[in-house]
């Protein structure tokens, strides 16, 4: 599972950290009510020292992941929600900055990957195309789960 973020301002963000929490509803039996559950997701990288262009935050879905057995139908039934919290230090204003976002089960794009959003410009400097931040393409069949 992947999320992509970018800094649309010219000021530097350092010591950027990401935390991703999974939330789902577990139905009770006849005597207990449904309960919302939470689990922190392990990330390939939780922190970057400098946030120059973009960052693709990755949670590997393997046997240790709470999402390992989830498919689209399970996500809907359990009313899955993914909470993303980003925190970093804005060098220009010497402030801690926060950003959070929530994704519900119906916003998940299955069997897709992000398209590249940066390329070399005419002077050789890297150009970041922010309009492509959410743009995805279908995975080839051999890479689909």
Regions inferred by a protein language model and the residue ranges of each:
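Generic alpha-helical propensity signal that fires on short helical segments
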Residues: 21-23, 31, 59, 100-104
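Extended, solvent-exposed segments with strong compositional bias
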Residues: 35-76, 88-95
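Extracellular Ig-like/FN3 beta-sandwich strand-entry sites
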Residues: 77-81
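Intrinsically disordered, low-complexity polar regions and short flexible loop motifs
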Residues: 83-85
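Canonical alpha-helical transmembrane segment with a positive-inside/aromatic-interface signature
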Residues: 1-34
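Short, well-ordered strand-loop elements centered on a beta-strand within folded domains, enriched
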Residues: 31-38, 97-98, 129
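Short, surface-exposed linear segments at secondary-structure transitions and domain or protein termini
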Residues: 24-27, 41-53, 103-117
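Acidic, serine/threonine- and proline-rich intrinsically disordered appendage/tail regions
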Residues: 56, 87, 92-145
């Amino acid at each position: 599972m992947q999320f992509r973020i970018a800094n649309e301002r010219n000021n530097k963000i350092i010591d950027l950290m990401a935390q991703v929490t999974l939330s789902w509803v577990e139905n009770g039996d006849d005597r207990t009510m449904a309960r919302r559950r939470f689990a922190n997701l392990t990330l390939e990288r939780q922190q970057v020292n400098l946030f120059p262009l973009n960052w693709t935050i990755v949670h590997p879905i393997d046997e240790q992941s709470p999402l390992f057995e989830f498919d689209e139908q399970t996500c809907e039934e359990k009313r899955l929600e993914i909470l993303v919290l980003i925190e970093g230090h804005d060098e220009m204003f010497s402030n801690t900055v926060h950003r959070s976002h929530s994704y519900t089960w119906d916003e998940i794009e299955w069997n897709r990957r992000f398209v590249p959003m940066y390329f070399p410009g005419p002077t050789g400097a890297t150009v970041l195309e922010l309009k492509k931040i959410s743009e995805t393409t279908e995975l080839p069949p051999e890479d689909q789960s």
